[in-house]
């Protein structure tokens, strides 16, 4: 319940701050599904199908943010909220990795790839039609689809999800049968 409440509060705060612009970010697409996932856990409903979609993106978002975006991020800006940043680019990954009752399989790699590809297609259409963030800037500095950098990062994000999903499915989850454990919330 703690993860669900934390993510829901952060989401509502972000929604008030960014308004309708919130869903131009891959982070919030993923966070939306993470809130649904933890909500389903709370209600005792099956979550396995959703877990296999969002685990790899949560890891890619965390690593991608801290390795690619954070070094260029205007941390001194008064609009930066470090708690919001830590929750949406780290805590969510930790929350999902601690869900030991869940398993993902290599054969499910298409799920995070489809999710990421749908987002990439949306972002290309959004930016291509002149869409910007609430500050009037591109949603991401690399979302320049009139230049090679935009396409390179789109492919890198998709490929990163492929590698992460295969890696996690291969190394964290062995071929041993899943052990029934209570849901950790």
Question: Where are the model-predicted features located?
Answer:
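Early transmembrane hairpin module of multi-pass membrane proteins
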Residues: 1-49
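Juxtamembrane "helix-exit" motif on the non-cytosolic side of transmembrane helices
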Residues: 12-19, 66-76, 128-129
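Non-cytosolic membrane-interface motifs at loop->transmembrane helix junctions
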Residues: 20-28, 50, 74-87
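Interfacial segments of alpha-helical transmembrane regions
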Residues: 45-57, 105-114
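Membrane-interface loop-to-helix entry segments
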Residues: 81-91, 152-156
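Alpha-helical transmembrane segments in multipass membrane proteins, preferentially the mid-helix core
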Residues: 90-107
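Membrane-interface transmembrane-helix boundary segments in multi-pass integral membrane proteins
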Residues: 127-172
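Non-transmembrane, juxtamembrane loop and terminal tail segments
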Residues: 177-185
């Amino acid at each position: 319940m703690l993860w669900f409440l934390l993510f829901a509060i952060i989401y509502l705060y972000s929604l008030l701050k960014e308004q309708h612009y919130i869903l131009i970010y891959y982070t919030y697409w993923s966070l939306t599904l993470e809130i649904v996932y933890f909500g389903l856990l709370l209600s005792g409903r099956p979550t396995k199908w959703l877990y296999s979609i969002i685990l790899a993106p949560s890891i890619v978002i965390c690593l991608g943010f801290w390795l690619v975006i954070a070094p260029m991020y205007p941390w001194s800006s008064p609009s930066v909220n470090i708690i919001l940043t830590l929750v949406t680019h780290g805590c969510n990954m930790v929350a999902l990795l601690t869900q030991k009752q869940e398993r993902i399989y290599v054969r499910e790699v298409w799920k995070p790839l489809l999710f990421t590809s749908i987002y990439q297609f949306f972002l290309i259409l959004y930016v291509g039609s002149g869409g910007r963030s609430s500050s009037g800037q591109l949603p991401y500095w690399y979302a320049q689809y009139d230049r090679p950098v935009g396409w390179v990062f789109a492919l890198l994000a998709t490929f990163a999800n492929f590698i992460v999903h295969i890696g996690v499915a291969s190394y964290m989850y062995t071929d041993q049968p899943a052990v029934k454990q209570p849901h950790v919330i």
